[in-house]
UniProtKB/Swiss-Prot annotation:
GO molecular function: double-stranded DNA binding
UniProt KW keywords: Cytoplasm, DNA recombination
Cellular compartment(s): Cytoplasm, Nucleoid
Name of the protein: Recombination-associated protein RdgC
Species the sequence originates in: Pseudomonas putida (strain ATCC 47054 / DSM 6125 / CFBP 8728 / NCIMB 11950 / KT2440)
Function, as annotated: May be involved in recombination.
NCBIfam families: PRK00321.1-2 (NF001461), PRK00321.1-3 (NF001462), PRK00321.1-5 (NF001464)
Keyword Cytoplasm: yes
Gene Ontology cellular component annotations, sorted alphabetically: bacterial nucleoid; cytoplasm
One Gene Ontology term from the biological process aspect of the record: DNA recombination
Family: Belongs to the RdgC family.
InterPro entries: RdgC
Amino acid sequence: MWFKNLLTYRLTQEVPFEPEALEAALASKPARPCASQELTTYGFVAPFGKGEDAPLVHVSGEYLLIAARKEERILPSSVVNDAVKEKVEEIETEQMRKVYKKERDQIKDEIIQAFLPRAFIRRSMIFAAIAPRLGVILVNSASAKRAEDLLSTLREVMGSLPVRPATVKIAPVATMTDWVKSQQAAEGFYVLDECELRDTAEDGGIVRCKRQDLTGEEIQLHLSTGKVVTQLALAWQDKLSFILDDKMVIKRLKFEELLQEQAEQDGGDEAAQQFDASFQLMMMTFAEFLPVLFEALGGEEIPQGV
């Protein structure tokens, strides 16, 4: 279990995440297939294992892991629009009258309902790790929308979930730009060979660089003309590499081989033990990494009451 992306959410109040109570809460909204006339369903699934006996909360030391699954029927808008257009033309030709918006919308609804049972189904899973002592929920996603879907559903079953995205005192853009401009990152961090530069003007240009020396004259020239760094490839110690963006989203997260090898040794041959060992080691790494990252970005803005 290694996250590939990371969104960090800060609990604004202390929440007693008791595994048994959380298990019962998640069980009140299990994932299920879409019915024939449903566009989408959303619910919780076991993060590891299958079957009714698989727990919805994976507990490893002080850390908890949960997962949710979304199932949706895929109706391409072009297919629906073509069918609506065809039906409208048929009515206007046969009945010699104009079809107005209200009737057109009704026709569209009827066509969607007719197409739904035959639509393809897409399933997607999302994981979230809860670290009560650290006061954070970590979501394995680069999409704030997908993360908010999970958190709002978790809030629904728990009754309350005081949480907000983690923020820092200095805009990540300013820090990343300074690191590239000065050719030196904060202690323990290393600038790699990929970045995105944007002009600060609303319609300004965008430059994306891959496999390029970011200390070179070309990059420095872009910075001198007013562009800022909005995405930056970084490494931390000998443990992680990732892309950090201007919204504090961590993408393309990669755990270095030494960590993965350690998890394999700790986990042994059983799949369940391997899963638990990698999750535990990942969370211990995050517990060390996130405070250092926040400090490098000017320090975290801690909500009152935490």
